[in-house]
Amino acid sequence: MPITTTAQVPPEVRTYFDRLLLTLARPYFIYDMFAQRRTIPLNSGDQMIFRRYATLNAATVPIQDGTTPPGDSLAVTDFSTQIKWYGNFVVITDQVQFTVQDRVLNESTRVLSLQLGLTLDTLIRNMMVATASSISCQFGGNGDTPTQITTEDIKTAVRALRLGNARLMTKPIPGENRFATSPVRSSYWGFMDVTIQNDLEACADFLSAANYPNPMDVLEAEWGSTNNVRWLLSTNGANSGTSNLGAPIWQNIILGQESFGVVKLGSKEAEFIVKPLGSAGTADPLNQRGSVGYKYPFATRLLNDNWITRLLSTQFF
């Protein structure tokens, strides 16, 4: 079947819809905000290898006069990932008049753009919840296993990340002489579904983002902080399995610096593809069908399980 790409669309139309695609897709990239970003040059294959050198133990043995110490050896760990292509399309009937002002074409682009954002967000989320590091909440009072999330559970997760040498991701926000505000600690970032935001707010040390000393320090989707975690809430949170009482188990992600990476191919953004009415030739003899679609090359990879953890919880409030 003949495929009509953007090369067959007038330049002014291509420019408009490409911008629309990027503008609508990016705000939904919540989970990729703190990724290590890498690019594979075009025509250089489709696999990326992240490499990390192991640290050396402290050299506490004094050097003896005239004696060469045994020395040490370097150890490296490689993490590989492969670019894969993702995409989708919708069919448009002959009611569409192919102009840049056309409402159906515009709305099709809008819907596909939102799907692209959700797709990338979900791919990264699924990669995160695949980490081998997990902690079940146990200090809540809902009588389930795991329990709802509490301050003590969050402290347990923070302690585990600290013991794994995960670096904190934000600097402290110092207090200011403003009514009802409080300072914010240096923090890891946490991801949580909005379904259990009431449980988060019920934590003993929860500080709403509205009560940060400076609202300019608040990220989009940031709900507040507890202990050494600042929380971003999304309707695209993850749950898997059921608890002892049959409730969904929510996967609350807490991470430090350089815990995961994302890879793109060259300078390519999402490719926006329009097939005008009749582009199928004899397969569409009456010019009744066209389509709008996108495709995007992408890969994501966990880089250190000690620097990311899942805090498993159920819902109480």
Where are these regions (language model features)?
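Beta-strand elements of well-folded, non-transmembrane domains
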Residues: 54, 94, 296-300
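Sequence/fold signature of self-assembling virion shell proteins
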Residues: 2-34, 144-171, 187-191, 195-317
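N-terminal "assembly arms/tails" that initiate or stabilize quaternary assembly
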Residues: 1-82, 308
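A generic local secondary-structure boundary/capping motif
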Residues: 38-39, 176-181, 219-221, 281
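Surface-exposed ligand/attachment interfaces on beta-rich extracellular proteins
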Residues: 36, 142-147, 178-181
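Short acidic, glycine/tyrosine-flanked loop/strand segments centered on an H-E-D-like triad
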Residues: 73-100, 266
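Alpha-helical scaffold segments that mediate packing/assembly in large oligomeric complexes
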Residues: 99-174
